[in-house]
């Protein structure tokens, strides 16, 4: 069996707020939450097979980078869905603006940034 990605861990300002919209938009659930490294707080949000680990530090860096040229940065998180249009409606209802829509072989996609300026790519494959 080839290796499989289990989770991605990234930093947010408010883990509970991020977890709430992730569950609403993607139909995920909170798998675990609790104290974390450096007096922070973490939540695991996703499905039975995979998840994102969102980490809220005790003190937040006021100058996060959003540049693709930053080494050790996160460019975007890609998520596949069964119904792109319905997911886009939920993304917009959560208060986020979608952009960079594209139809391509073998599917369709759009992007959005959350309140922490983390970029997400949402894809529906045909």
Which ranges hold each PLM region?
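Core segments of cupin and vicinal oxygen chelate
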Residues: 2, 9-52, 93
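Vicinal oxygen chelate
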Residues: 1, 88-126
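Conserved beta-strand in the GNAT
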Residues: 53-55, 121
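A short, acidic/glycine-rich surface segment
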Residues: 38-39, 60-65
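Short amphipathic alpha-helices within nucleic acid-binding modules
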Residues: 21, 85-90
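Short hydrophobic/aromatic beta-strand micro-patches
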Residues: 9-11, 78-82
